[in-house]
Amino acid sequence: MIKIITGRQSDPLQTEIIGRAARNYLAQPGKDTFIIVPNHIKFNTEVSAIGKVAQLQGREETSVKNLHVLSFSRLAWFFFKKADLLMPESLDDAAATMILEQIIDKRRDELLLFKNSHANSGMIKQVYSTILQVHTGQLDLGNLLERAADPAVALDLDNETRDKLHDLDLIYQDFLEIVSEKHFATKDELNIQLNQLLASRPDLVSQASFYVTDFSHFSIQEKMTMQLLAAFASEMTFAFKTADGSVIEPAAGEYDYVVQKTIKDLTGYFSAHDFAWEREKIASPASPARDLNQAWQGQGQPDLNNLQLVKADSRYAEAYFVARTIYDEVALKGCQYRDFLVLAPNLQEYETYLAPILRQNQIPFFDDLQQQMKYHPLVLLLENLGKLLQQAGDTPALLSIMKTRLLIPDWYLEGDAEAGEAAYLRDIDQLENFALAHGIKYSLWQKPLKDFTKAQVIALDQEQYQKWLDRLDKLRDFFVSKISRLARQLKSEKDSMTAVKLFFDFLVKNGVSARLEAWRLKASESGDLQQAQQPEQCWNLLLSLLKDYLLVNPENFAWADFFKMLTAAFSQANFATIPASLDAVTLSEYGMVQTSGYKQVFIIGAANGSLPQINDQPNFLTTENLASLADFFDQDAYLEDSQQLRNLDQEYQFGNALALASDRVYISYPVINSNNDLLDPSIYYKRLLKLVNGREYRQRDLPDIAEKDRTEFARQLLLFLTSPRASLGYLAYAEENSAQSPLVAKLVELSRQYEEEKAEEIAEGMAYDNNPQDISEDLAERLYGKDLLSSVSQLESYYQNSFEYFLNYGLRLRPRAENELNAIQSGNYFHRTFELLLKEMQKKNIEIDKLSELDLELLLKQVRSEILQEPLYQQFLRDPFNEYLFKVFDKTTSKVAQSYRRKQQENKMRATYGELAFGPAEKLAGLVLPLKKFAGQRKISLRGKIDRVDLFNGDQHVLGQLIDYKSSDHSFNLARFASGVDLQMIAYLDVLEKNRDLLAGGRQFDLLGAFYQYVTRKLNSVNSSSTGALFDSKLQLKENLLGGEDKLKLSGVFVSEPAWYQEVDKALEKKATSSVYRGLKLNKSGGFGKKDNFFSQDEMRELLEYVEALIEDAASEILSGQIALNPFRQGNNTGLAFSDYKDIFYFDQQLPTNSYRDLPNLKKADLLALVEKRLRQRE
């Protein structure tokens, strides 16, 4: 007898079916009773069925023998075992992909779509999916194409569909032939073989009863299984949920079209074959769930007190609302955790919110979101082995393999294995540091590490670390030699069996399987069953894939295809999940079938774009293709547009979700996503909001501290409270940000009684101040020494942000060295080029203005060749791109040098010193300043290098100027100098002044200025609106701007003595504008006029004194242990812009204790007034 039971979505059909099956089992215990359900709910349904049997028996517990709760796949295996039928080896998706790639390559000339195009992995996957549909649908593509080509048939296909079918037919026939030859079974073969078995062996089910529930649609083969069971089984009962429990003629677009069509297909088959069947509509009891279901379908508008809509500030607020509600319901109303179900359209979006918050509130939960295998260490090992075979010495791949901890050398594990593993990981970190610092990649991994130490770029390069370096070299050789040997073996091997054996032996002999087993045992002993099964599942899948590969490709081994198959298979694989507890909250994805019996259901993430779940993923045969094929299908052979069916079923599926709760449904959405983008509610949410007349709860991230009414504030605060541990943060926030409240104080006191240590941590966190504390003078002396030896750039960093100075030069923290040709290294290359150029000219007693353009280039070529032989630059040249960059740099230095050569023909200043070092033990004395704060008992010594010093020996005096090379355009900024952020130019002038006798040989020495030399190849724009445009307003060419020559003029700080510049700059004899100095122009009276960067000799002397005061102040504060998080800010430039220590600072301008030190805009008069004031204080 066949029964079709129907009811509303809110009716307990699943419970009804389980009850009938249990009673049937008890009435006929010797016969098989089957409950067929979707795989996702098999476990929970089995628990419910056994529980129902126990209830009917009047027991608390029971066992069953012939009551089976199965999915379709498990049903197939059940009967295969019963019939002693062995199924062929199941074909993995990765193996199927490999077969299809081989077919397409072989058939390429015959194919239409793939003839001239590459079939990528995504397209292959679509083709395979369509092949499975064709196979399941029993469709004869060749016959279909013949019918479409027959003029007598009044049907036709468009060109796209015909071409796709043509290619699909060729590929499909070859695929089936290969699968048959290899004795494989495709993943849809289970149902096909099951149906063949049932058709040939009706005795297997003739005494059995079947109960089918929680399906709204069957695939073609599943439908055939139902038809066969209906024909041969002793009893067959179906349960379907329709709009109102009635069965009507299906019409596309109707609410329950899909399930009605399923019922129609079944009953039509029953009637056509004269099967006796009856329909039963169960009573639909009044309930809140039925009211909500009716309202959702537009059947009346009852009072929906069981529906709560929630608008949340964020996903965190959504997750906290779920946890707080569950906590309250369990703690105050006697609910159990298994009464709650949480659904999300994309559960992965909430993975980092829900799980931690539920754990914090000690709420047990089962997350049925499957974990992907592709991040497991074994999978990373396999994937990176493939990369190393493709590109030997791929540094990221090699380091990734080391970090998997699957190939640890034996010498680390002798003795204490845990300590040995820790030592191994430390050595891997140091080896990575060394490799990155020296640019070790590809074939360089074959070299001993000592070959790289000449560059001296990392501490391990120093002789004192030789033993450590030897240990790292031993580790390097271990991995490189083993992997290189494996690569050679696999690349040279042509026999698949031998190659796979070599690969498998490599894993086993190097301890990979043993490590996996050790991880499994450790996780099992700690009670983490989910973690314990992962190593075993990964290893078993690998074994299965190796077997598949040998079946698909037993002869001609291709290592690239082998690793491609492994990577593809693991990228799609998931770990099986284990329910953590029978009493736990269930977290699941919306759209998956769920068991009944939940009291409260949360549907989170109900934002526009998430609900409804419209599926528009590309398929090989599109919806349009399938529509044009529809006329060629019949009831026993067809292809379903599963995507269209899912889209048509969206409202029905949402109705199913609403009907899962017997008591209450919560639907929420966040107003922003994790990127802070605004989100709109789903159209479903808006529709329900109208049904409840706009009744909506607002879940905030935090209690509203702006609430003045104490009673209302207390009510809001209580809505955030759960366990003492989880509530402490909210209570601390309320205590700090609200007026004195006896309630808050009492709640804080109560929480402290349970979580005293946590309360202290939160109190400290609430009072946390990221500003550093000063250190003692004694500790400062231990860090810096009694006297301070420093450079100008170091002191500038102190004024930019003194905390950074402490981290860099006190604690000596450094970012990890990397072998990259960055802005600093390019600047060093420019400096080195000009330094050696000057030395070479002095060595040969050559004046640059006497050289021809060609001679200068030859000299530069000689200098560059010398530089690139240095160990550091040899290291950079290992990267071909760096070789290109050096050529670009050389063009820049050539332009600057040639410009300098031309200008020297009109300038009498001569480059005398390059990279002139000053300081202790140098020929040129540095600044040595006693510190008044320490009564002169301590001092600062300034050291450094001046890029270039130019001198002019005149009749009356010697003039000196310093040149500083810059890779970006610079000017002398008064505010930055006044604040100490830019000390360099004036401090270096002070050094020259202090060494006047050495520089001038006892003659009168005068400072001309300090200037920036912009090292650039930039040109001026043709159509710029700025003064740098090549054409003026009358479209006249500005010849002085051609070639960007104006950018190469010297700019900086000038001593305002016109006669001195006329003495050295020949151009000023003919015209008022200098060709050497930017911004230098004589007025009619022969002066310079008022300019902020021009200073008289007396003013310059004051600046020199002032810079000494700044240096003395910085040194005194450093040696006193003063530290502050005080970054400067000037416009868009800040002391944090290029900092390597931002993750330490945690600087946040929104915090009341964090603020920038804003530099004022200063004119020359303002600067001089400030200087005079400071000098008076110094006296």
From Swiss-Prot:
InterPro entries hit by this protein: ADDB_N (IPR049035), DNA_helicase_suRexB (IPR014141), P-loop_NTPase (IPR027417), PDDEXK_AddAB-type (IPR038726), Restrct_endonuc-II-like (IPR011335)
Top-level enzyme category: hydrolase
Protein name, as recorded: ATP-dependent helicase/deoxyribonuclease subunit B
Recorded GO MF terms: 5'-3' exonuclease activity; ATP binding; double-stranded DNA binding; helicase activity; hydrolase activity, acting on acid anhydrides
Function description: The heterodimer acts as both an ATP-dependent DNA helicase and an ATP-dependent, dual-direction single-stranded exonuclease. Recognizes the chi site generating a DNA molecule suitable for the initiation of homologous recombination. This subunit has 5' -> 3' nuclease activity but not helicase activity.
E.C. number: 3.1.-.-
Family named by the database record: Belongs to the helicase family. AddB/RexB type 2 subfamily.
Gene name per UniProt: rexB
Top-rank taxon, per record: Bacteria
Disulphide-bonded residues: none
Subunit structure: Heterodimer of AddA and RexB.
PANTHER family: RECBCD ENZYME SUBUNIT RECC
Other comment: Despite having helicase-like domains, this subunit does not have helicase activity.
Keywords of the record: ATP-binding, DNA damage, DNA repair, DNA-binding, Exonuclease, Helicase, Hydrolase, Nuclease, Nucleotide-binding
HAMAP family named in the record: AddB_type2
Pfam families reported for this sequence: ADDB_N (PF21445), PDDEXK_1 (PF12705)
Cofactor needs: Mg(2+)
GO biological process: double-strand break repair via homologous recombination
